[in-house]
């Protein structure tokens, strides 16, 4: 056809029948990928330990999205919360995956049908007989249908009126479960961590979409506006669609990275800011002080800390610790966590309680420094032993564990104390199995990090795509040298189509 590879999509510019065919095929590919990816993830997923080896530690990407929408059970007899399941019903993880694959096949067949039967009366202007699309009307139809879907999701699925609800948890990711959510119409609905805002915003946006769709179906655009915005050009649709997609991608990159009610930490892992701000450390400290006020011993107080909460307070679960070129799930890095050793409390020979300075997010190595409650450095692991003043040996540091597997155990051997001081830099201390997956000890990012990176990157690329196609449609006459108001048929390439009587045939 004489088109370079990067311009082959122009063959559907003035061909509504095949334009719908390629969009159907694209939807088939997206749906097929989602279903296939879900089945792959379910095949490699180990649901046996939802506390220390949750889905986000195993690198699952599409399963968390299914879970937040209300899917929690598997035909394999397990549920995401750890219970055994006898009857998962149709809408299990595998059921949803199978539905996507079946839908993909139907879209594939529809794409083939529309590719073959491209010359439909539906796409011909009865006045001129030429292929055409009433783009403003199509815009109204899409707006109306998406509004209905948006409203239905907020009013029925999220609220539990006709659906399971969504995943809701507490700020510390301990009590998460699928439950109905009532809409919140006050100012608190704008808080990104309030689940009720998800219901109310979908209801409000859906109503707006329905009204806007009806408006665009019943009111024609003014001729000046129609021409100014090139509403008759399909590339205008492409440009504005790309704008909607890149804007959405930027928004979800932000809600994922910074956290929100729609991206719960039980499904996607903690955010880096929870480590930076000592979010879980502060909650653990509050619980310990509360227990101590009830006259519990340190050992009893630490034994009451949920293992799940302690595990969040570990730098290996920070999505910013994994490099972009370190492929694989978190478990491939520091291994599969198998147990919490307990909280390490360091003391010098004078009886001062010492706190190990924690490693900041963006450091790979960090000096081991132990300070007292007032921030005065009292011990360290020196770089140059000859000049050391505060070495573990000189200061006589000991370590004792409270809670966890080493509850009540203490060590005074300097080598052992140093080992645990180094590990305490990384938060709470966990024992990991590195043998099973041949884990290399190098931190990986969680699905939260990968989602953010992917969506921010593609949003940037799509932003440039919007500028490019917007410029092409607004200044088409300048780029092509053709008057946009010209009535003459302009042929950019030779169209070769099944059943097209105008297609040139080679003379045999």
UniProtKB/Swiss-Prot annotation:
GO terms for cellular component: chloroplast thylakoid membrane; photosystem II. SUPFAM superfamilies: Photosystem II antenna protein-like. Keywords: Chlorophyll, Chloroplast, Chromophore, Membrane, Photosynthesis, Photosystem II, Plastid, Thylakoid, Transmembrane, Transmembrane helix. It is found in: Plastid, Chloroplast thylakoid membrane. It holds the Pfam family PSII. GO terms for biological process: photosynthetic electron transport in photosystem II. Binds multiple chlorophylls. PSII binds additional chlorophylls, carotenoids and specific lipids. GO terms for molecular function: chlorophyll binding; electron transporter, transferring electrons within the cyclic electron transport pathway of photosynthesis activity. The chain crosses the membrane at residues 21-36, 101-115, 140-156, 203-218, 237-252, 457-472. Belongs to the PsbB/PsbC family. PsbB subfamily. One of the components of the core complex of photosystem II (PSII). It binds chlorophyll and helps catalyze the primary light-induced photochemical processes of PSII. PSII is a light-driven water:plastoquinone oxidoreductase, using light energy to abstract electrons from H(2)O, generating O(2) and a proton gradient subsequently used for ATP formation. PSII is composed of 1 copy each of membrane proteins PsbA, PsbB, PsbC, PsbD, PsbE, PsbF, PsbH, PsbI, PsbJ, PsbK, PsbL, PsbM, PsbT, PsbX, PsbY, PsbZ, Psb30/Ycf12, at least 3 peripheral proteins of the oxygen-evolving complex and a large number of cofactors. It forms dimeric complexes. This is Photosystem II CP47 reaction center protein. It comes from Huperzia lucidula (Shining clubmoss).
């Amino acid at each position: 056809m004489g088109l370079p590879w990067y311009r082959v999509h122009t063959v559907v510019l003035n061909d509504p029948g095949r334009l719908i065919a390629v969009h159907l095929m694209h939807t088939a590919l997206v749906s097929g990928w989602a279903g296939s990816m879900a089945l792959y993830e379910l095949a490699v997923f180990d649901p046996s330990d939802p506390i220390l080896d949750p889905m986000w530690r195993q690198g699952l990407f599409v399963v968390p999205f299914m879970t937040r929408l209300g899917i929690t059970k598997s035909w394999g007899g397990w549920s995401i919360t750890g219970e055994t399941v006898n009857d998962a019903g149709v809408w299990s993880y595998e059921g949803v995956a199978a539905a996507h694959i079946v839908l993909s096949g139907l879209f594939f067949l529809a794409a083939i049908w529309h590719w073959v039967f491209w010359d439909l009366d539906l796409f011909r202007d009865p006045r001129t007989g030429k292929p055409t699309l009433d783009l403003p009307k199509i815009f109204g139809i899409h707006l109306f249908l998406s509004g209905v879907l948006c409203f239905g999701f907020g009013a029925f699925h999220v609220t539990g009126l006709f659906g399971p609800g969504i995943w809701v948890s507490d700020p510390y990711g301990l009590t998460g479960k699928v439950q109905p959510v009532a809409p919140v119409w006050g100012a608190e609905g704008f808080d990104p961590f309030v689940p009720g805002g998800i219901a109310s915003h979908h209801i409000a946006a859906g109503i707006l979409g329905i009204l806007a769709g009806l408006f665009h179906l019943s009111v024609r655009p003014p001729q000046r506006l129609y021409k100014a915005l090139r509403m008759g050009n399909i590339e205008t649709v492409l440009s504005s669609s790309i704008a909607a997609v890149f804007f959405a991608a930027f928004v979800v990159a932000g809600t994922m990275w910074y956290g929100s009610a729609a991206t719960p930490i039980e499904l996607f892992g903690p955010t880096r800011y929870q480590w930076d701000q000592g979010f879980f450390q502060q909650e653990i400290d509050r619980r310990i002080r509360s227990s101590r006020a009830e006259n519990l011993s340190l050992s009893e107080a630490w034994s009451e800390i949920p293992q799940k909460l302690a595990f969040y307070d570990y730098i290996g679960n920070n999505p910013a610790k994994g490099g972009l070129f370190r492929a694989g799930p978190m478990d491939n890095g520091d291994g599969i966590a198998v147990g919490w050793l307990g909280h390490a409390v360091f003391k010098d020979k004078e009886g001062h309680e010492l706190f190990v300075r924690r490693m900041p997010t963006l450091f790979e190595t960090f000096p081991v420094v132990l300070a007292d409650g007032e921030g005065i450095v009292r011990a360290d692991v020196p770089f140059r032993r000859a000049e050391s003043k505060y070495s573990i040996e000189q200061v006589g540091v000991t370590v004792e564990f409270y809670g966890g597997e080493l509850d009540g155990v203490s060590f005074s051997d300097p080598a052992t104390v140093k080992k645990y001081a180094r590990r305490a830099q990384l938060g709470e201390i966990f024992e990991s199995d590195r043998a099973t997956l041949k884990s290399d000890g190098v931190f990986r990012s969680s699905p939260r990090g990968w989602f953010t990176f992917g969506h921010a990157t593609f949003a940037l690329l799509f932003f440039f795509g919007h500028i490019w196609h917007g410029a092409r449609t607004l200044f088409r006459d300048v780029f092509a040298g053709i008057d946009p108001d010209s009535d003459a048929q302009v042929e950019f390439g030779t169209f070769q189509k099944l059943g097209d009587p105008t297609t040139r045939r080679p003379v045999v």
